[in-house]
UniProtKB/Swiss-Prot annotation:
It is found in: Nucleus; Cytoplasm; Endoplasmic reticulum; Golgi apparatus, Golgi stack. The modification Phosphothreonine is found at residue 762. It comes from the Eukaryota. Its main location: nucleus. This is Deubiquitinating protein VCPIP1. Residues 1208-1220 have a biased composition (Polar residues). It comes from Mus musculus (Mouse).
Amino acid sequence: MSQPPPPPPLPPPPPPPEAPQTSSSLAAAASPGGLSKRRDRRILSGSCPDPKCQARLFFPASGSVSIECTECGQRHEQQQLLGVEEVTDPDVVLHNLLRNALLGVTGAPKKNTELVKVMGLSNYHCKLLSPILARYGMDKQTGRAKLLRDMNQGELFDCALLGDRAFLIEPEHVNTVGYGKDRSGSLLYLHDTLEDIKRANKSQECLIPVHVDGDGHCLVHAVSRALVGRELFWHALRENLKQHFQQHLARYQALFHDFIDAAEWEDIINECDPLFVPPEGVPLGLRNIHIFGLANVLHRPIILLDSLSGMRSSGDYSATFLPGLIPAEKCTGRDGHLNKPICIAWSSSGRNHYIPLVGIKGAALPKLPMNLLPKAWGVPQDLIKKYIKLEEDGGCVIGGDRSLQDKYLLRLVAAMEEVFMDKHGIHPSLVADVHQYFYRRTGVIGVQPEEVTAAAKKAVMDNRLHKCLLYGALSELHVPSEWLAPGGKLYNLAKSTHGQLRPDKNYSFPLNNLVCSYDPVKDVLLPDYGLSNLTACNWCHGSSVRRVRGDGSIVYLDGDRTNSRSTGGKCGCGFKHFWEGKEYDNLPEAFPITLEWGGRVVRETVYWFQYESDPSLNSNVYDVAMKLVTKHFPGEFGSEILVQKVVHTILHQTAKKNPDDYTPVNIDGAHAQRVGDVQGQELESQLPTKIILTGQKTKTLHKEELNMSKTERTIQQNITEQASVMQKRKTEKLKQEQKGQPRTVSPSTIRDGPSSAPATPTKAPYSPTTSKEKKIRITTNDGRQSMVTLKPSTTFFELQESIAREFNIPPYLQCIRYGFPPKELMPPQAGMEKEPVPLQHGDRITIEILKGRAEGGPSTAAHSAHTVKQEEIAVTGKLSSKELQEQADKEMYSLCLLATLMGEDVWSYAKGLPHMFQQGGVFYNIMKKTMGMADGKHCTFPHLPGKTFVYNASEDRLELCVDAAGHFPIGPDVEDLVKEAVSQVRAEATTRSRESSPSHGLLKLGSGGVVKKKSEQLHNVTAFQGKGHSLGTASSHPHIDPRARETLAVRKHNTGTDFSNSSIKTEPPVFTAASSNSELIRIAPGVVTMRDGRQIDPDVVEAQRKKLQEMVSSIQASMDKHLRDQSAEQAPSDLSQRKVEVVSSVRPVNLQTGLPEPFSLTGGTENLNTETTDSHVADVLGAAFATRSKAQKENSMEEPEEMDSQDAETTNTTEPMDHS
């Protein structure tokens, strides 16, 4: 058989109802050759035309003419997209593309044909509902599903009701993969046949083969799609066919006795069953006799086509199947005319897959020419004229125009979904997603829908299903059962770490996101998925994953972006945000408030909504105040006065001097960009021709530079040389624009802008002409407070002078912050010195006293404090806080990307770049923007979990804070410093009284974690009360005893004792003798043990104990001397405070973590090498007074996978190993 020629090019699709080319630029994009070289590289965006999807799509203007939707999987022509426009801010889009390209992350896996959604329905979704449609119908009055027998329509749906229906595909869906044109090779195989049909229809393409899934039910899928366009009735068709054969078996046997043996009919009937599975090796399936039976079930003819060569052959590869067992008068529709035939075809020469041929909506009904009308199968040929209305030329019309409306079909599906939920307790769309992500992705095919439904239901009940908020992909928290049994990975890890496992403890495995309990009867670990949490998406590795309920809804956290579109949000992301069970257009603004009543002081944070499109969602000041007072002072007599005070406080906080001033609460991931979901912003449209990642203050050799041409090298050199000059020109231009910008709005014309909350009265916006004085509360970072009255015309420099008079702080040492979150009040730009400060009556400002600046005259000092970076201020003065936040987010995104490319976590990569923690670095800038810089202020970063940092004003940098030892400069060897200090501090702890530890007996150190006894509580542990802050939403917060911090702060500056490695050289003879033994190793200053873990000589132990006592005495003596010297330098006003510090500092240092009982000196250092990223053991113990030598770093052992243990009653699933 000769291979047919390739198909001719397809005609262009018809224009959409609303042409997106609304501007000359977009019109040029559609015309070839009408674009310049630069504009050919533009990026366009548009929305998916599917009304149930409408995802935002991005594509190059010169790219493919068809775009695949990243949300529903459909492929659309560019002309069919809605709202096509040029993207003027491609940065985020390119950033996402770069991430995907370099990491090989394509987001959610490509949707296969079963999961492509059209009008919100996928093929697999329809398959799941089909068994329900065989027994249920929809009540027209209520729209709810009812059993057919309750509607007096029998037990089984009668498919003859679909005898006059035909599906016509929408033109925009013709090329949708999995729904439109079949792509299994049928277009090539049927090319000649389709060309003949096309010529018979005035050269118009009006009958096309469409896709059906090849899952063993392709015949009934093809018939169902030809009838209603969906695979909804495959189950009913099979049951109808089986029932039809059983009821008319005698007639069939008589009609086909010459062709089909009587013994075959049992197999033929069994093959109709929906659950039929053919015996292994037996090629059974639906065939011609079943097509003939379906024609009689539907009361309409079915035409089977093949390639021209197949139709001309002697085989039964094509035929016309007539409903010959049904009287012709019963094969008519409501209009009295004969039901028009439907058409199916073979998809390949293998003839093992059926596909339907359907017409196109809006085009003429397809006609099949006489020469392609096959002979009748199984019945006399003259019956064709009896059951098919032939045209004058001998052809016939295919299908007809009576289609089920999409609106009715969606109502029918929604009614069946309710029944599915009632029967199985899970939504069919969720089952379809489980099949996509957990079966198809692993190559598992042929799994019955019942099995997938049961597996999905169990995963939901076990809290193992999570959905990514960015990609919408499902992830499963699953651990192989063999890992939890004896000999398994996790079982052995728990056994080796904690010894005998106990049923009253929970065992945490942070690297596997798993918490387990122990079953002593079965001797296995049992996963507790209620306490376990999946922390990253299995597809994109993002952290925005949330649990999924059985109905498919997501268990959102406050601040999460939902899938609901928002039209009036100020945040600009285009979606609503979840907060306390409701969906809002915006994230709330947050501000602190203090309640005082009856000697009790309570501090709370108020979350305020004020810009909602639905006014009922706006916060009501009286409701908020009443809830606060009722929450903390329930039933208090006379609390109405407190309510009124709270109302006034909230009104002061929410009164807007500028209606556009919107500073929402910072939620990590709340505005994370989804795939194809980025909104364009106003930036330069010049697109980069190369994408290059650069680090701060470092030169990076890029991949593109390896094969650069000479011209490219010259251009790059010119750009490098001219960059500073161009930047300076740009800065000067911005200065001139700012200086020459006229004020076009008269103060008298400013209207009062009331709040959008009807029940919440607000103040009028700030107006410089108001005659009222403004009272401002000022607080310094050393604890002083005052109320200052300002005139309406008070300028920045007058405010500085008022602060200097009130607190005796020179202007050059003042850093003024206002608003929430606090932001620095910058000095006025050139020419605007007389402008009043943007403060309102009732505002609060904070004064940060700068340190380490050279004192000078007031004028020069003020210049050094605020105007050193005037060029930078001129450039960045116009940037909003949102833009600054986006810039920091992009820097962090690039850092995370580079860390992933290097195969390291963020901390391991960042510690090798100390400049990131110094002035100008990304972490330094985040802390400065969010909370301000003050010496000794602590903070944490969500990208560096388990790490606490402190600002060192003298060095102007961030340093790593380790709970028990002090602060360390960031560098590649900082972990070595910490681990060395862990050994030293542990050795010191052996000399202290075990009873002096406040948490004695509650914690035990293990090689991989901490075990908490289930029956005991940590009542006597004091939480951290210092200046610690969390930037964003970190996963955990260290808790530090202030007494230990005061003590260790003194120890850090102590110079009386040398803790370096050199001190071991001057040990007494007993240690010299001990060290001469090749088996003795040093685990801390003055502490040695046996390498093989055996006990050493008791005399040596006693000598070690005495030596440690001498060291502690020396330390305490040095502390006393240091404190006496320090106290002598302090002012008399601070004397009482210093006495308290001396008492707390010279008190023996108590570690918050108890030691194993009994504590053995033979523990070895290898078991202490745990990662501080996942375990807080090093954070509890660690300090670094000496630098690990190079040899130690080279000989350090590989750290074992670690695990933790926690109380079974602990509910903190985010950080199972919390410590105090």
